Amino acid sequence: MALLDLAQEGMALFGFVLFVVLWLMHFMSIIYTRLHLNKKATDKQPYSKLPGVSLLKPLKGVDPNLINNLETFFELDYPKYEVLLCVQDHDDPAIEVCKKLLGKYPNVDARLFIGGKKVGINPKINNLMPAYEVAKYDLIWICDSGIRVIPDTLTDMVNQMTERVGLVHGLPYVADRQGFAATLEQVYFGTSHPRSYISANVTGFKCVTGMSCLMRKDVLDQAGGLIAFAQYIAEDYFMAKAIADRGWKFSMSTQVAMQNSGSYSISQFQSRMIRWTKLRINMLPATIICEPISECFVASLIIGWAAHHVFRWDIMVFFMCHCLAWFIFDYIQLRGVQGGTLCFSKLDYAVAWFIRESMTIYIFLSALWDPTISWRAGRYRLRCGGTAEEILDV
């Protein structure tokens, strides 16, 4: 009996610690968003003396927004940069899109690389290798095909690249688009994702996604260059780790990494979340414990039980009140990341928020059930530590 009581006291203590940690994350991310995001960065050096940047753009396939997204990179207001467009397959329709833009912007230093170079199992690295090997500037900007920018995006990122900074990254977010699937994505990338992403970076944990990353090429070369990360599927995590291990700091751009894919659906979003969860579980096994208890409904039940055990409060009343507070703070977070008026109603937000929160356990269990992932037309079996092997169809 004494052992059971001790276990219950321990669980109650855990519940209160969880409460403090999660709400610190809420406050940290909201305050950081208000103070840092969507602000004009201070110019650290004269415009004419900004260092050159090599933009590496991995492309595969075409969606309705691809040409408009790509065109924003040809219209950057930056004194010295090159655009290196990378397409793996010779019959990829993205090649025609690239050629059209190369013809439209002859004054932009841009080249097209077709065929890639097989150096490992990561298809993105394989696609980028030829461009990386001939990149002529000291700063490398790897940016996904679905990202769109505004004219001063690169200037903002380079201004964050101060003396001891080795990597500048953008907080992933989603552009305003039509349909409920777009709303669901926007709610996730404006609430749950920035709460974890920002609070991790504020407290010193290196949390980086590779959607838009500006890095020092010499530091990457010291780590073995891009080829050193071809054995991983989550190459962005391991590149960031290699840079941090060499004593360099990270900085976050004041502008978000604006995803604007023209192809999206609820099933695509769900598959993406499952794939990301599988990668996190294999890279960071502690995710198995930490991730489920950091989500609203599970956390509210644990904390509600702790409050009932200590204060005899009604669990369901506490659960509902805690979820309501979470819901409100998430809306504040979302408005901060958006930096303006949302394109959907509060009712749309409420429905999308509830569905997203309800999906979390299914996503997590699905990730545990099957250790293989499908990505860029390939299938891979993940191994502990983040490496993977390609599954070849016989």
Curated annotation (Swiss-Prot):
Resulting phenotype, residue 322 to A: Inhibits activity to less than 6%
Motif (Q/R)XXRW in this chain: 272-276
Pfam families on file: Glyco_transf_21
Effect of residue 308 to A: Inhibits activity to about 35%
Gene Ontology terms, MF aspect: ceramide glucosyltransferase activity
Impact when changing residue 169 to A: Inhibits activity to about 30%. Decreased sensitivity to PDMP
Chain location of the short sequence motif D3 per the record: 236
Catalytic activity, as annotated: an N-acylsphing-4-enine + UDP-alpha-D-glucose = a beta-D-glucosyl-(1<->1')-N-acylsphing-4-enine + UDP + H(+); UDP-alpha-D-xylose + an N-acylsphing-4-enine = a beta-D-xylosyl-(1<->1')-N-acylsphing-4-enine + UDP + H(+); N-(9Z-octadecenoyl)-sphing-4-enine + UDP-alpha-D-xylose = beta-D-xylosyl-(1<->1')-N-(9Z-octadecenoyl)-sphing-4-enine + UDP + H(+)
Domain of life: Eukaryota
Motif D2: positions: 144
Ranges annotated as spanning the membrane: 11-32, 196-215, 288-304, 310-328, 349-369
Pathway: Lipid metabolism; sphingolipid metabolism
Residues annotated as catalytic: 236
Side of membrane Lumenal, spans: 1-10, 216-287, 329-348
Result of altering residue 26 to R: No effect on activity. Decreased sensitivity to the inhibitor PDMP
KW Lipid metabolism (keyword) present: yes
GO cellular component: Golgi membrane; membrane
UniProt effect for mutating residue 322 to D: Inhibits activity to less than 6%
Outcome of substituting residue 153 to S: In strain: Wistar
Keyword Transmembrane helix: yes
Quaternary structure and partners: Interacts with RTN1; regulates the ceramide glucosyltransferase activity of UGCG.
Notes on the domains: The D1, D2, D3, (Q/R)XXRW motif is a critical part of the GCS active site, involved in catalysis and UDP-sugar binding.
Function (record text): Participates in the initial step of the glucosylceramide-based glycosphingolipid/GSL synthetic pathway at the cytosolic surface of the Golgi. Catalyzes the transfer of glucose from UDP-glucose to ceramide to produce glucosylceramide/GlcCer (such as beta-D-glucosyl-(1<->1')-N-acylsphing-4-enine). Glucosylceramide is the core component of glycosphingolipids/GSLs, amphipathic molecules consisting of a ceramide lipid moiety embedded in the outer leaflet of the membrane, linked to one of hundreds of different externally oriented oligosaccharide structures.
The protein's name in its UniProt record: Ceramide glucosyltransferase
Biological source species: Rattus norvegicus (Rat)
Gene name in the database record: Ugcg
